[in-house]
Amino acid sequence: IGFDLAKYSEIDYAKDLTDKLNIKNISEKISKEEYMNALSEVYYHMDEPTADGCAIAVYFLSRLASKDVKVVLSGEGADEFFGGYNSYDDNFYTKLPFFIRKSMASICKILPKNKITRYIIRRGLPLEESYVSINRTYYDDELKDVLKIDNYIKNKDIVKDVYDEYKDYNKLDKMLAVDIRYWLSNNILTIVDKMTMAHSIESRVPFTDMKVFEVARMLPKNYKVSDGTTKVALRNAARKVIPNDAWKKKKLGFPVPI
């Protein structure tokens, strides 16, 4: 599944890869009109509000798959178990001492809010607050002003139990734990289950098998994220069976043009 905007579509790349592997490829591009028209049906099948636009992409992907199969295999869990998200990797700025990032954040709080200032503000927070705030729209002080109440649940309080449990673990393991406990189980798997069932097909997620998890949790940090490369162990395993440009490819994810 892809969209009209090239940066939101891997259809051409997928076609090239499947041709090299002699695998049948079926794809479909979704227009803006189709996307918007599907909103009400997607949220009907979700049974609850969701702010994740990829639910609609999975809806269309499931619709396409349902024309030929009744059961599909999906890759959910690989990123959370093996370190697949780019946010797991430290860049130049996040490697700066915390007191410098905190000072920069204080300055940016009084500047007009944009993508850059919000990034600097978030990186000036402790991990317990900064990581869970990656996709949020409002910071706590802004939310307090909008809601006009004081007793709302803060993001850091939602995930406090995970950080308390993993307080002696390294930074990467803490982020993985948060994503497994909340992002994977409460969002991703829910979306895949409901969107496939909306088209009367079933999804199987082999990466979430307990034996796979036990292997992943024993891997050292550099086998997950190292020098800008994510999912190191999986890439090394895949290099034996897929072309170099495939296992070296930077992760795009499943973005939607919203």
Feature locations, PLM:
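ATP-dependent adenylate-handling active sites, centered on carboxylate activation for C-N bond formation
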Residues: I1-N155, K194-V241
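PAPS-dependent sulfotransferase catalytic core
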Residues: I242-I258
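Globin-like tetrapyrrole-binding proteins
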Residues: L184
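Structural motif
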Residues: P49-A51, Y166-D179, T229
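A short, charged helix-loop
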Residues: Y152-E165
